[in-house]
């Protein structure tokens, strides 16, 4: 039996990855992290989506220590999410160490249940300036986990080389575009579905959807080509 662990936030990207994982694996587990994020609604949305998609194994893990160490607009209510980059060249929504911690803990969970893969929705094409969404980082951490646990494990990144329009196309390929659009929470201001329309996350999501709906055939063809090359 093939098992996988999906790092699941209830957002567009992780939900699309989950939908794909359900098709590709015999048993899918989800893990969601409570790190004192700006909106607790994120966890409720994640729980609701997993139930709707028939996932029976969904672990919500308390990693509040990350909130104590990582100061970000996503961990502090008194810091407004900004469209401008900080002096270090990163957006103020970057939570340092988040994906390092999440993927490491997910790898441990995969070890315990005998899963062959950890699946995450990080994406270098639309990575918003986050260094821990880069392919180079994921491959490096993957190697460290394999060495540290002396067990084969693959961190899968189905969206790594897709832009947002192609990510919408992937959801549509599984006949779940409307589900992803209506049920997920991507907005930094905590509004489900199409969101506030003003934050950086909503801007990226909306632009991708508009692009896909306007150029469906061409974008779907691009997605299929990337899938044939093993890039999705």
From Swiss-Prot:
Co-factor requirement: Zn(2+)
Q: Which UniProt keywords apply?
A: ATP-binding, Ligase, Metal-binding, Nucleotide-binding, Queuosine biosynthesis, Zinc
Cysteine pairs forming cystine bridges in this chain are none
- Describe cofactor binding as the record notes it: Binds 1 zinc ion per subunit.
Q: What class of enzyme is it?
A: ligase
Known EC number: 6.3.4.20
Q: Which InterPro entries match?
A: QueC, Rossmann-like_a/b/a_fold
Query: Which GO molecular function entries does the Swiss-Prot or TrEMBL record give?
Result: ATP binding; ligase activity, forming carbon-nitrogen bonds; zinc ion binding
What Gene Ontology biological process does one annotation of this record name?
queuosine biosynthetic process
Q: Where does ATP bind?
A: 8-18
Residues recorded as binding Zn(2+), renumbered to this chain, are 187, 196, 199, 202
Pathway note: Purine metabolism; 7-cyano-7-deazaguanine biosynthesis
Q: Which reaction does it catalyse?
A: 7-carboxy-7-deazaguanine + NH4(+) + ATP = 7-cyano-7-deazaguanine + ADP + phosphate + H2O + H(+)
Which HAMAP family does the annotation name? QueC (MF_01633)
Protein family according to the UniProt entry = Belongs to the QueC family.
Describe its function: Catalyzes the ATP-dependent conversion of 7-carboxy-7-deazaguanine (CDG) to 7-cyano-7-deazaguanine (preQ(0)).
PANTHER family this protein is in?
7-CYANO-7-DEAZAGUANINE SYNTHASE
What protein name does the entry list?
A: 7-cyano-7-deazaguanine synthase
């Amino acid at each position: 039996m093939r098992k996988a662990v999906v790092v699941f936030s209830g957002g567009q990207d992780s939900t699309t990855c989950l939908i794909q994982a359900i098709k590709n694996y015999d048993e899918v587990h989800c893990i969601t992290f409570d790190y004192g994020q700006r909106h607790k609604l994120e966890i409720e949305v994640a729980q609701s989506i997993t139930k709707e998609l028939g996932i029976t194994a969904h672990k919500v893990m308390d990693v509040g220590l990350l909130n104590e160490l990582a100061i970000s607009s996503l961990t502090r209510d008194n810091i407004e999410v900004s469209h401008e980059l900080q002096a270090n060249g990163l957006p103020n929504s970057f939570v340092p160490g988040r994906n390092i911690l999440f993927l490491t803990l997910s790898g441990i969970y995969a070890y315990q249940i005998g899963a062959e893969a950890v699946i995450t929705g990080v994406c270098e094409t639309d990575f918003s300036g986050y260094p821990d969404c880069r392919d180079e980082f994921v491959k490096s951490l993957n190697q460290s986990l394999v060495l540290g646990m002396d067990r084969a494990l693959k961190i899968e990144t189905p969206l790594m080389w897709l832009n947002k329009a192609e990510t919408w196309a992937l959801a549509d390929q599984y006949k779940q575009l409307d589900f992803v659009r209506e049920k997920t929470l991507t907005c930094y201001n905590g509004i489900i579905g199409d969101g506030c329309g003003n934050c950086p996350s909503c801007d990226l999501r909306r632009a991708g959807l508009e692009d896909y709906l306007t150029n469906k055939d061409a974008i779907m063809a691009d997605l299929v080509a990337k899938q044939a090359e093993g890039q999705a």
